[in-house]
């Protein structure tokens, strides 16, 4: 499955750092894709193939309209980005094998069928194709991803409760 072959697909490409916005735009232009910039405020048309998220602070909004998410920085040895952000929207999370920045949560997501590990462009295409054509498969992974998030909420409160006997009492 490819954007060129599937006119109803829309890729939302969000560079992690603002200095990469220009590179993303040039890459999309060079590929010959029809695109809009999020910063333009333009609503994507039926012929838009890519939306470049070139604004700050809107990643969670963009995950909220997605059917699945590939979390970058993980196919190369950068360590990946936060998989809990897409998991919060109950969408399948795909990441490469380099997840050392979020090792523990990625392990939990993997064990719970909330994370799909891909190794290269071909495996990304294969998994995305399966997720987009098999709704049950897509919903399964999304449901398990958000369950991991719910199971791990409140960690700070639990930690503070455990530490309470050892913390000095504050006088009011």
What is each residue range found by the language model?
Residues 4-172:
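Nucleotide-activated sugar donor-binding and catalytic core shared by glycosyltransferases
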Residues 1:
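Phosphate/diphosphate ligand-binding glycine-rich loop within oxidoreductases
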